[in-house]
Amino acid sequence: MAENNVYGHEMKKHFMLDPDYVNVNNGSCGTESLAVYNKHVQLLKEAQSKPDFMCNAYMPMYMEATRNEVAKLIGADSSNIVFCNSATDGISTVLLTFPWEQNDEILMLNVAYPTCTYAADFAKNQHNLRLDVIDVGVEIDEDLFLKEVEQRFLQSKPRAFICDILSSMPVILFPWEKVVKLCKKYNIVSIIDGAHAIGHIPMNLANVDPDFLFTNAHKWLNSPAACTVLYVSAKNHNLIEALPLSYGYGLREKESIAVDTLTNRFVNSFKQDLPKFIAVGEAIKFRKSIGGEEKIQQYCHEIALKGAEIISKELGTSFIKPPYPVAMVNVEVPLRNIPSIETQKVFWPKYNTFLRFMEFKGKFYTRLSGAVYLEESDFYYIAKVIKDFCSL
């Protein structure tokens, strides 16, 4: 584990967290660093200093530099990446503008994030599609999973497969790179939900080249809130549109041979959001200054594992050890049922923390997230909180 004087509570000075708030739920909202926040505010001020110049010339130019930095981080050609506000935006953009044909099938997982399911259901109803689901447990055998995927491909010949890199709850790491290879083999469109990937799971998208992939920079990369990278394979640039439709779509319609239309479409659709997207470059710089991706990911993985060990021992339950470098852990909790939202609204402020819980296949779990500002003592406190929560 990294030296204590580098990671742990000393790191809190780099974030805007309440000093007494115990944040073991980074996987939900992420944690923006102070350096990134300051850069974001600076960019917002610049955007208002000369609105027309900034909106139409300078901000798009700054955006290009950030795209290049992000491309290096995830091993992609910068021409294949654009920004949108969330993973929900990403999946909606792909599913709602893709050129479906009647009776196409979308295949997905039972642990898909709810908004992915909603978007798939909407596309199904709009275009008269078929929707099928692969059921998985809280742990998967990679070979058996891939065999099941291939069997489904052969049996029902889906048009597209939506697969997670790392599912939200329960936390499951999927062999997404091998899934993409299978999709290529059977000419199936690969749509990869990488919401928890960038800053968390190393990626080389030029090598894997999924058809579509979206990943939230605000979760694990310490970027401003609502900031998502959307990867679109070069061959698919003309298959989707940016939502909402904007001037980029108009340019596309006018040009018989459009140049870099993907970038134009998305920049025009999100012009007012460019400052926060540009600030992602500062997030990459900040993370380099505190040790770099490999060291950060190692610490987050190790402290999440240690936290799960502490809590499961205190509760007398078990946890599912995630593979490296996953920094989210499923811990079983002795709940009989999950308290109401109204009860939780009173409970969590009292304890100055927050956790998510779910029932999955007859067991209750909470999800722990590692972070550079956490230490073992935080998880002893969380164990006490969970005990009190389970007694509600």
From Swiss-Prot:
Q: Does the keyword Nucleus apply?
A: yes
The protein's required cofactors:
pyridoxal 5'-phosphate
Pathway it belongs to?
Amino-acid biosynthesis; ergothioneine biosynthesis
Keyword Cell membrane on entry: no
* Cell compartment(s), UniProt: Cytoplasm; Nucleus
Pfam families given for it?
A: Aminotran_5
From the UniProt record, give one GO term of the biological process aspect: ergothioneine biosynthetic process
A GO molecular function for this record? hercynylcysteine sulfoxide lyase activity (ergothioneine-forming)
* EC number of the protein: 4.4.1.-
**Major location category of this protein:** cytoplasm
Keyword set for this entry? Answer: Cytoplasm, Lyase, Nucleus, Pyridoxal phosphate
- Locate the N6-(pyridoxal phosphate)lysine modifications and list their residues: K219
**Coiled coil regions, renumbered to chain:** none
> Which InterPro entries has this protein been placed in?
Aminotrans_V_dom (IPR000192), PyrdxlP-dep_Trfase (IPR015424), PyrdxlP-dep_Trfase_major (IPR015421), PyrdxlP-dep_Trfase_small (IPR015422)
Null-mutant phenotype, please? Shows substantial decrease in ergothioneine, accompanied by accumulation of its immediate precursor, hercynylcysteine sulfoxide.
Q: Do you know which SUPFAM superfamilies this protein is assigned to?
A: PLP-dependent transferases (SSF53383)
Would you name any one GO CC term?
A: nucleus
Q: Which reaction does it catalyse?
A: S-(hercyn-2-yl)-L-cysteine S-oxide + AH2 + H(+) = ergothioneine + pyruvate + A + NH4(+)
Q: Which family does it belong to?
A: Belongs to the class-V pyridoxal-phosphate-dependent aminotransferase family. EgtE subfamily.
Q: What does this protein do?
A: Catalyzes the conversion of hercynylcysteine sulfoxide to ergothioneine by cleaving the cysteine residue at the sulfur atom, the last step in the biosynthesis pathway of ergothioneine.
For this entry, the protein name equals Hercynylcysteine sulfoxide lyase
State the species of origin: Schizosaccharomyces pombe (strain 972 / ATCC 24843) (Fission yeast)
